[in-house]
Amino acid sequence: MQELGKVESNSIRVTRQDDKRITIEKDLDTEHMVLSMGPQHPSTHGVLRLECITDGEVIVEAEPYLGYLHRCFEKHCENVDYPGIVPYTDRMDYLAGMNSELAYCLTVEKLLDIEIPRRVEFIRVITSELNRIASHLVAIGTYAIDLGAFTPFLFCFRDREHIMNLLEWISGARMLYNYIWIGGLAYDVPADFKKRVAEFVTYFRPKAVELYKLLTENEIFVKRTKGIGIMPADVAINFAWSGPMLRGSGVKWDLRRNDPYSVYPELDFEVPVPDGKFSDVGDCLSRHLVRALEMEESLKIIEQCLDKMPEEQGFDPRALIPKKIRPKAGEVYGRAENPRGELGYYIVSDGKSTKPVRCKARSSCFVNLAAMKDLSKGQLLPDLVAIIGSIDIVLGEVDR
């Protein structure tokens, strides 16, 4: 690495590399300090504890401690029938319940080998993309407030409220929806669904541009995030990263494009990745940038779905839902692109029971958080807040 700055004295040599990591060589025999960050800390986005070993203000190692929000999700699934698991999935990533429900239902439908009505497919994608935008607004708003910018937080939650009202109008709930069911939906959308969703798209498009100018192009925000927590593409792949974290490292991988499901093969949209002109590829700013740009792509997807969604009088989205779900014996893995990455479910059926023998959830947040040691080593302690915020973790999904 190229050395950007070097300070020497008789007893200490401090070097800052081009990725802003700091190395300290010294002749003094000093002890490292151990700092416990969390489990109740404003920047941890939930009950996460980090044990940080520091050399002065430089992080030597940051070890995450998990499990404070463990609720036995996978064990509960063994004692609940297949449809009864849907509400539990809402409570994993509670900021993206529609996406969590979709991933689970796709997996069971794959095991049952059933076909879903086209109208249902389009409604599922529209509600999931609305939820994706709402989730990214939380990620961006809370990231801003982590770094001391309060106004963008208010802008994000102002616009998110429009989506929450829409989803409540469609499903009856603001966060824990229980709307996407195996084989269909809980019920059809209201009569003026297309009109209200189209109005939101028209409203939000200039607001997304406004937010980009307010925060992403803000000089102070750029200084706090550019070059911090760099993760090279090959290392990100080895850690099995996915979602905005992987795309922030320059890898163009999105399950909606690379392993498409539902009606995504029929839709035209881009997969944003940083080009290195505005940010250093793989840094905190790149990960934020991907989320900011993805919101516009979600708007494009919603518009196309509104145009293509078939109108059906007297449509019953529950008509194809079997009253008793008893899949054939076998196992299946299904996955979908959640706002934080690949959310997958591995389900085992014995062919006799209406309950799964095993239901394993693959959490993107858990996998992304596993790289915390590599991301934080050599960084300054104040930059740890920027690194945690850039991961966009939801501890309900991490701990399950």
From Swiss-Prot:
It is a peripheral membrane protein. Keywords: Cell inner membrane, Cell membrane, Membrane, NAD, Quinone, Translocase, Transport. One of its GO terms (molecular function) is NADH:ubiquinone reductase (non-electrogenic) activity. InterPro entries: NADH_Q_OxRdtase_suD (IPR001135), NDH1_su_D/H (IPR022885), NiFe-Hase_large (IPR029014). GO terms for cellular component: plasma membrane. Its EC number is 7.1.1.-. It comes from the Bacteria. Pfam families: Complex1_49kDa. Signal peptide: none annotated. NDH-1 is composed of 14 different subunits. Subunits NuoB, C, D, E, F, and G constitute the peripheral sector of the complex. Belongs to the complex I 49 kDa subunit family. NDH-1 shuttles electrons from NADH, via FMN and iron-sulfur (Fe-S) centers, to quinones in the respiratory chain. The immediate electron acceptor for the enzyme in this species is believed to be a menaquinone. Couples the redox reaction to proton translocation (for every two electrons transferred, four hydrogen ions are translocated across the cytoplasmic membrane), and thus conserves the redox energy in a proton gradient. PANTHER family: NADH DEHYDROGENASE [UBIQUINONE] IRON-SULFUR PROTEIN 2, MITOCHONDRIAL, NADH-UBIQUINONE OXIDOREDUCTASE 49 KDA SUBUNIT. This is NADH-quinone oxidoreductase subunit D. It comes from Chlorobaculum parvum (strain DSM 263 / NCIMB 8327).
